């Protein structure tokens, strides 16, 4: 007898007879649903579907029977609908004919079920019953009702599922979602509808216009006015508009207000660079500002206000005169100074040459004669100097300059490639050499660069070299992906990171002019910083001015001098002794990570979603950092990572849900922490704190995997003693030991003084080495947690509230199950003095040690069989 034949199995036959009745099938599935046996449940469901005379009508019978049964978590009704959808797709039989009478009858029933069911049923019902072709009037009425009830998310989701967007429109459905910061849902709503996408952009762009107040819109939706509207400020919203504009391929003319806001943001940035950081020359500042402001009256007014806020009236008037700003758009004090300058015939210059000379004395100076800086703009120039550029066994510094782009859609293109060798600097004019793309100059340039980068005997020095070289492909197609051909490269960005992590003291500078990047590295190694005032200049202008030539040469030549200094005294900078011989560093790449061969470290990941992989600076081991000396601040998207790092003893601060990512930069600067972030803020944060002080973490990894990646990246040493040396909740590293008898007494006093406590909020907040629960696991034999901390004394507690420390911290005793007090071998508890959490020895310690065993330093493990330590004396 075939065991697979229902006729040979009485129980199976009974199931088939039962399955012909949809309600009996539902009853059987409800019984299995409570057991959570998903495999058995699926098999029973599919057998039942096959036995139903009409599976579609049977589904509706079951759903109608389930109406009104709402609960938390996944519903059985939604699961059955999804399973029938899968079952139908696996059947060879055709579905009901479109527009047939039978299908219309089923659609009418399905629409009625849908209007009385949770949103999770929408997708499977729409697929099974082809609801996109059903009577849309009932569906539209239901969506409008959801919207009227303030269930905006459900209305938009259902409308998109049923393809009702054309009838529903975009303004009505998207405005309340935008007010609730549900941009992703709005994007899904308009996906596949180009006309709606354009209307959405027009709507969002209208909110970016000068003088617009988003609160006027929010007042029409009282259900969402309590939410924060910061993300809908013109500055933030314009970023979203420009992102969607590029994604949808919409012409920039459709979003003029967002472009204006972007130009205003660029003006703020340039004013900060010029007047606060003083890292931009007046000439370059004027050049960029004129291009941004143009003839826009509103931008002229905004620029006038920026000038007044960043400088005095005299300086503001000088700038206004150079920029030809209309006098009527200037504040009164600035207008007075401007009229005075015009009477004099020119703006007074306060001995700027003397100031420039003083500035030059403070910065790194090019140590070679000016005649040793060569500008190569033709294939003949390249041929003449090819021997010097490609000389074997030499060290060269490589850098690229490009004109910054301040408007959306622009792509920076390289203008100049600098190659420094001992005693000389060669400035390769990329603009001249790359035109025409198939010309003799372009071919000679591409061939020379490829030879230089692929020769392993030539050590190429750079600072973020990969990011620089990637731009060469935009001007020279033959050099696309040239960064992957690098052999014998050394990126000083990684070396700088190791120096910073090893606590090489940064120079004491004015906070506003705080050094970063290569300028800071030059300051730390050579004693004077690199002058970056020409960095944002117009590198496409020809001929280059003398200041640009000197800056470009110094930018590349300083790499040679930094490398020489590091090789002479590596110990001074906490680097490996064999740094001088490190031309082909050994790689320690994480599986799946892509890096160009022969390069020590990429400047930044192509997309800031993945943790850059640490690579040794030399054949020797990179400097290690003890876990307890490693200090980080995590943004609010990485709170799980912060808790995992605390679990291993790392001092990890985390931002609250309401704190902006700019707060991370403030904390990092004030407390000397490294920023761990994810997503778009990475590049902005890295620019604020400097190279090596900000890391982008892959959000697709679990928290413990993220922790491993971060610790490996910074070469952090973790020992068994570090595990749980910090409180995972508050980051405090101070504990008090509490004996078991004392804990019994405290729990008894607390319960009798305040009455029985609920194990709700406090219980869920209290977390321990052994997770709180009614029946805790015992710790593995010999696996103990013994913190060197003092024992809790009665004098440490307040007399009137025995569960509160003298400083006001309340011990979270409600999180300790009574059963834990009876655990054999449990000697004591640990109380965090920062937040009052209670911890105790349990199986969680062993699990953490096992999970991170490849990270733990070889040392005696508390999880190896050994006599459990006990206190020399007990005060109780």
From Swiss-Prot:
Required cofactor names: Mg(2+)
Pfam families listed in its UniProt record: DNA_pol_A_exo1 (PF01612), Mut7-C (PF01927)
Domain 3'-5' exonuclease: 517-571
Keyword line: Exonuclease, Hydrolase, Magnesium, Metal-binding, Nuclease
Gene Ontology biological-process entries: nucleobase-containing compound metabolic process
Span list, region Disordered: 578-607, 751-781
Segments crossing the lipid bilayer: none
InterPro entries to which the protein is assigned, alphabetical: 3'-5'_exonuclease_dom, Exonuclease_MUT-7-like, Mut-7_DEDDy_dom, Mut7-C_RNAse_dom, RNaseH-like_sf, RNaseH_sf
Protein known as: Exonuclease mut-7 homolog
């Amino acid at each position: 007898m075939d065991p697979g034949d229902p006729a040979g199995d009485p129980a199976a036959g009974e199931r088939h007879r039962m399955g012909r009745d949809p309600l009996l099938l539902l009853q059987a599935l409800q019984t299995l649903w409570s057991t959570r046996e998903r495999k058995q449940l699926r098999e029973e469901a599919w057998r039942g579907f096959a036995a139903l005379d009409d599976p579609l009508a049977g589904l509706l019978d079951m759903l109608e029977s389930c109406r009104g049964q709402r609960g938390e978590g996944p519903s059985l009704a939604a699961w059955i609908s999804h399973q029938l959808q899968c079952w139908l797709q696996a059947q060879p039989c055709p579905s009901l004919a479109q527009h047939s009478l039978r299908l219309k009858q089923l659609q009418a029933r399905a629409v009625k079920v849908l209007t009385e069911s949770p949103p999770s049923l929408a997708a499977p019902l729409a697929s099974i019953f082809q609801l996109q072709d059903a009577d849309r009037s009932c569906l539209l009425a239901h969506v409008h009702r959801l919207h009227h009830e303030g269930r905006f998310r459900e209305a938009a989701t259902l409308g998109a599922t049923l393809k009702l967007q054309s009838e529903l429109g975009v303004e009505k459905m998207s405005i309340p979602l935008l007010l609730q910061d549900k941009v992703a849902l709005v994007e899904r709503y308009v996906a596949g509808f180009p006309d709606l996408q354009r209307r959405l952009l027009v709507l969002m762009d209208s909110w970016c216009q000068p003088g617009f107040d988003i609160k006027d819109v929010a007042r029409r939706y009282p259900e969402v006015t309590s939410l924060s509207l910061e993300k809908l400020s013109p500055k933030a919203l314009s970023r979203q508009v420009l992102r969607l504009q590029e994604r949808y391929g919409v012409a920039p003319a459709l979003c003029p207000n967002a472009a204006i806001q972007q130009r205003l943001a660029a003006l703020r940035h340039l004013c900060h660079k010029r007047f606060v950081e003083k890292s931009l020359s007046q000439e370059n500042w004027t050049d960029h500002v004129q291009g941004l402001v143009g003839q826009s009256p509103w931008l002229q007014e905004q620029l006038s206000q920026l000038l007044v806020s960043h400088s005095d009236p005299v300086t503001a008037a000088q700038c206004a005169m150079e920029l030809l700003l209309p006098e009527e758009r200037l504040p009164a004090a600035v207008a007075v100074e401007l009229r005075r300058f015009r009477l004099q015939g020119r703006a007074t210059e306060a001995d700027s040459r003397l100031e420039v000379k003083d500035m030059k004395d403070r910065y790194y100076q090019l140590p070679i004669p000016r005649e040793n800086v060569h500008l190569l703009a033709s294939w003949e120039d390249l041929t003449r100097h090819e021997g010097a550029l490609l000389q074997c066994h030499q060290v060269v510094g490589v850098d690229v300059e490009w004109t910054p782009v301040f408007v959306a859609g622009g792509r920076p293109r390289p203008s100049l490639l600098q190659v420094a060798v001992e005693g000389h600097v060669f400035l390769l004019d990329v603009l001249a050499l790359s035109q025409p793309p198939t010309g003799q100059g372009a071919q000679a340039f591409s061939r020379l660069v490829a030879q230089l980068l692929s020769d392993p005997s030539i050590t190429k020095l750079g600072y973020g070299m990969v990011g620089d070289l990637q731009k060469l492909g935009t001007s020279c197609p033959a050099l696309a992906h040239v960064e992957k051909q690098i052999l014998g490269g050394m990126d000083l960005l990684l070396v700088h990171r190791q120096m910073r992590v090893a606590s090489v003291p940064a120079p004491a500078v004015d906070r506003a002019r705080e050094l970063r990047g290569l300028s800071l590295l030059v300051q730390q190694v050579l004693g004077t910083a690199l002058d970056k005032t020409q960095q944002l200049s117009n590198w496409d202008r020809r001929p280059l001015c003398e200041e640009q030539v000197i800056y470009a040469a110094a930018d590349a030549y300083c790499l040679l001098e930094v490398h020489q200094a590091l090789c002479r005294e590596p110990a001074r900078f906490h680097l490996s002794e064999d740094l001088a011989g490190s031309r082909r560093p050994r790689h320690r790449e994480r599986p799946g990570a892509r890096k160009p061969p022969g390069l020590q470290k990429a400047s930044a990941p192509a997309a800031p979603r993945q943790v850059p992989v640490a690579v040794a600076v030399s054949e020797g081991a990179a400097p290690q950092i003890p876990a307890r000396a490693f200090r980080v601040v995590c943004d609010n998207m990485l709170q799980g990572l912060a808790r995992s790092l605390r679990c291993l003893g790392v001092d990890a601060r985390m931002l609250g849900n309401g704190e902006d990512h700019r707060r991370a930069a403030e904390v990092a600067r004030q407390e000397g922490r490294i920023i761990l972030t994810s997503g778009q803020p990475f590049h902005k944060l890295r620019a604020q704190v400097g190279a090596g002080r900000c890391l982008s973490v892959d959000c697709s990894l679990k928290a413990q995997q993220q922790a491993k990646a971060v610790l490996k990246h910074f070469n952090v040493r973790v020992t068994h003693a570090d595990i749980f040396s910090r409180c995972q909740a508050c980051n405090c590293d101070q504990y008090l030991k509490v004996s078991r008898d004392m804990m019994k007494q405290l729990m008894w006093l607390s319960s009798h003084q305040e009455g029985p406590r609920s194990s709700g909020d406090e219980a869920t907040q209290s977390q321990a080495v052994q997770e709180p629960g009614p029946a805790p696991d015992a710790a593995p034999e010999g696996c103990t947690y013994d913190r060197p901390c003092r024992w809790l004394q009665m004098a440490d507690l307040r007399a009137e509230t025995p569960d509160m420390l003298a400083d006001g911290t309340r011990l979270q005793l409600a999180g300790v199950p009574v059963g834990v007090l009876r655990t054999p071998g449990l000697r004591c508890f640990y109380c965090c003095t920062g937040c009052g959490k209670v911890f105790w020895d349990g199986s969680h310690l062993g699990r953490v040690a096992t999970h991170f065993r490849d990270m733990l330093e070889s040392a005696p493990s508390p999880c190896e069989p050994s006599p459990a330590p006990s206190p020399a004396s007990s005060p109780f």
